UniProtKB/Swiss-Prot annotation:
Region Disordered, residue ranges: 211-294, 395-416, 461-510
Keywords recorded for this protein, A-Z: Cell cycle, Chromosome partition, Meiosis, Nucleus
Protein name: Sister chromatid cohesion 1 protein 1
Summary of the tissues where the protein is detected: Isoform 2 is expressed at low levels in buds, leaves and roots, whereas expression of isoform 1 is confined to buds.
Gene symbol of the encoding locus: SYN1
UniProt keyword Cell cycle present: yes
CDD domains: Rad21_Rec8_M_AtSYN1-like
Organism superkingdom: Eukaryota
Length: 627
């Protein structure tokens, strides 16, 4: 350090320029050695003067030395600003603390570091005799708003005699140290019947207080029945009796009796309106509804097993609660539901669409049930048909009929049975042979029925609605493959209307023996009852051509991959075989799996051809026939 200073002095100037105690010397030491400078030295340093000396030095300075001194000035200035900031904050805290009120320490708490308290801190002051004055008279003054007594719960009594410890002698203070004064242990008498102020207004003020009616109404008259309702005055004090008057004199007794009579009369006057108000029916007060709070029973309760099972199996509580529930929401009118049920089947699944009234009239006209006047003529035939003899006769005639001839007749014309059924129903006793003979219809009938088929796409034929059916290998079809309208099944019976509240109309599977227009073929006859599993059914309309299955619409990603592959394979000079592993380069596991899935979809649809020579090997894709 000394060697460096001597070198600087010899080169740039006198020894006083960068001396240790000089301002520039301290700046240079703070910049190079980061020396600590205390508050005193920092206060003595004048930053303005040092900056002027660096800018206009008395001796020439090198640029390096001036730069070092400038850095030292910045360091010293930062330290001075930090000290100033700390002083200002401390001063602000002290000012705030001076205006803040300090809490008084608790005298019962010991200060920190002390284990013994002072005698004055733990010693209570001696009791001083206080002169309460005539406190009993002030209690009767009506200015006390909170003063309130009850008639049935008031008892007047004296605990001590009036002459006990009234005038304690000064020489007996040591003996009377543990004896309480009479004023401290004597209850004050509220009625004040023996005081000088004997006015009835002050004495009976407690009977006229507000809210006394409600108190009398809420209290039970049986409670406190043994307590006397009249106030018994206590004997007066000795200083209240005038001198020269004997307490037991007749004059004194007359005064007491007069007071009692006046008190009884006042009590009767006060009780009469109370009884009248008590007899009046009071309106029931509404109580505030309390919120339901959950209560936890922590006691251990043992319930027998059969009792617990009976609780679980008892559903009376559930049924009672279910009856009280009300259906919320708007109920749809029955008329609207009935009209909607009569709409075509296609409109039952479409809520917002409207059906044209002209088309609805045409549809209802074609599906209208023919009403007949003779509804009872159908029942004897049904009973006759359901008899065992009729069934056996039908079966016997069926076996005698040539099966080839019957099938040939039914195959000549498929559209004629609708007209056959309409003509056969006009006669009651029509036989099966006449039905089969009438199956040959005229060309005009066939053309008119063909025109009726094209009314609606969901309705084929005028009288018989059916679905196309194909006979089985045995020449008989199941009864579930055909639906026969009620016009051909029950011409003389009224068609039951289906409503939302009633069940559906019975179908042909429930009563197959009611269809008298068809013959039955039984493979075997059961012992108790017959079944109509095998029945020859006639097609009432031509077999409809089945629509081809619509091709599934490709997804957007699949279409995009398909278009890219098609563009690639159609590009001249492009390779016709691509590797799936090369296409999946740079993809993560999820994206590669999706690419493999899309490739499988395209291969399934014939867009591309997929080839894999070895398991877990490279997958090659090429152009497919459907691209």
């Amino acid at each position: 350090m000394l060697r460096l200073e001597s070198l600087i002095v010899t080169v740039w100037g006198p020894a006083t320029l960068l001396a240790r105690k000089a301002p520039l010397g301290q700046i240079w030491m703070a910049a190079t050695l980061h020396a600590k400078i205390n508050r005193k030295k920092l206060d003595k340093l004048d930053i303005i003067q040092i900056c002027e000396e660096i800018l206009n030095p008395s001796v020439p300075m090198a640029l390096r030395l001036s730069g070092i001194l400038m850095g030292g000035v910045v360091i010293v200035y930062e330290r001075k600003v930090k000290l100033l900031f700390d002083d200002v904050n401390r001063f602000l805290v002290e000012i705030n603390g001076a205006w803040r009120t300090k809490s008084v320490p608790d005298p019962t708490l010991l200060p920190k570091g002390k284990t013994h308290a002072r005698k004055e801190a733990v010693t209570l002051p001696e009791n001083e005799e206080a002169d309460f004055g005539d406190f009993e008279q002030t209690r009767n003054v009506p200015k006390f708003g909170n003063y309130m007594d009850f008639q049935q719960t008031f008892i007047s009594m004296r605990l001590d005699e009036s002459h006990v410890n009234n005038n304690p002698e000064p020489e007996d203070l040591g003996q009377q140290f543990h004896q309480a004064d009479a004023e401290n242990i004597t209850l004050f008498e509220y009625h004040g019947s023996f005081q000088t102020n004997n006015e009835t207004y002050d004495r009976f003020e407690r009977f006229d207080i507000e809210g006394d009616d409600e108190t009398q109404m809420n209290s039970n008259p049986r409670e406190g029945a043994e307590i006397p309702t009249t106030l018994i005055p206590s004997p007066p004090r000795h200083h209240d009796i005038p001198e020269g008057v004997n307490p037991t004199s007749p004059q004194r007794q007359e005064q007491q009796e007069n007071r009692r009579d006046g008190f009884a009369e006042q009590m009767e006057e006060q009780n009469i309106p109370d009884k009248e108000e008590h007899d009046r029916p009071q309106p029931a007060k509404k109580r505030a509804r309390k919120t339901a709070t959950s209560a936890m029973d922590y006691e251990q309760t043992i319930i027998a097993g059969h009792v617990y099972q009976s609780w679980l199996q008892d559903t009376s509580d559930i049924l009672c609660r279910g009856e009280k529930r009300k259906v919320r929401g708007t109920i749809r009118p029955d008329m609207e539901s009935f009209k909607r049920a009569n709409m075509p089947p296609t409109q039952l699944f479409e809520k917002d669409s409207s059906y044209p009234p002209q088309l609805y009239q045409l549809w209802s006209k074609n599906t209208q049930v023919l009403q007949t006047s003779s509804s009872e003529s159908r029942h004897p035939d049904l009973r006759a048909e359901q008899s065992p003899g009729f069934v056996q006769e039908r079966m016997h005639n069926h076996h005698q009929t040539d099966h080839h001839e019957r099938s040939d007749t039914s195959s000549q014309n498929l559209d004629s049975p609708a007209e056959i059924l309409r003509t056969v129903r006009t006669g009651k006793g029509a036989s099966v042979e006449s039905m089969m003979a009438g199956s040959r219809a005229s060309p005009e009938t066939i053309n008119r029925q063909a025109a009726d088929i094209n009314v609606t796409p969901f309705y084929s034929g005028d009288d018989v609605r059916s679905m196309p059916s194909t006979p089985s290998a045995r020449g008989a079809a199941s009864i579930n493959n055909i639906e026969i309208s009620s016009k051909s099944r029950m011409p003389n019976r009224k068609r039951p209307n289906s409503s939302p509240r009633r069940g559906l109309e019975p179908v042909a599977e429930e009563r197959p023996w009611e269809h008298r227009e068809y013959e039955f073929e039984f493979s075997m006859l059961p012992e108790k009852r017959f079944t109509a599993d095998k029945e020859i059914l006639f097609e009432t309309a031509s077999t409809q051509t089945q629509k081809p299955v619509c091709n599934q619409s490709d997804e957007m990603i699949t279409d995009s991959i398909k278009s890219h592959l098609k563009t690639h394979f159609e590009t001249p000079g492009a390779p016709q075989v691509e590797s799936l592993n090369k296409l999946a380069v740079g993809m993560d596991r999820n994206a590669a799996a999706k690419l493999f899935f899309q490739s499988c979809v395209l291969a399934t649809r014939g867009v591309i051809k997929v080839n894999q020579a070895e398991p877990y090997g490279d997958i090659l894709i090429a152009r497919g026939p459907n691209m």
